[in-house]
Amino acid sequence: MIVVPVKEGENIEKALKKFKRKFEKTGIVKELRSRQQFDKPSVTKRLKKERAVYVQKLQQVED
């Protein structure tokens, strides 16, 4: 359970932003989306390799 302490006089918008940040860090939504459909392990590995190559290319261009 995510708990966000709200200080006296603190803006609700700020507290909501903290909650959203903590919620995203837990990865619940990402996990739920990934579990909606089964992917074969071979497909998962292939996608992971493709992402790694893409990120590596971006880093090379950045340097």
UniProtKB/Swiss-Prot annotation:
GO cellular component, as recorded: ribonucleoprotein complex; ribosome
Keywords attached to this entry: Ribonucleoprotein, Ribosomal protein
GO MF annotations, alphabetized: structural constituent of ribosome
A Pfam family: Ribosomal_S21
Record carries keyword Ribosomal protein: yes
Classification via InterPro entries: Ribosomal_bS21, Ribosomal_bS21_sf
GO biological-process terms attached to the record: translation
Family named by the database record: Belongs to the bacterial ribosomal protein bS21 family.
Protein name, entry field: Small ribosomal subunit protein bS21
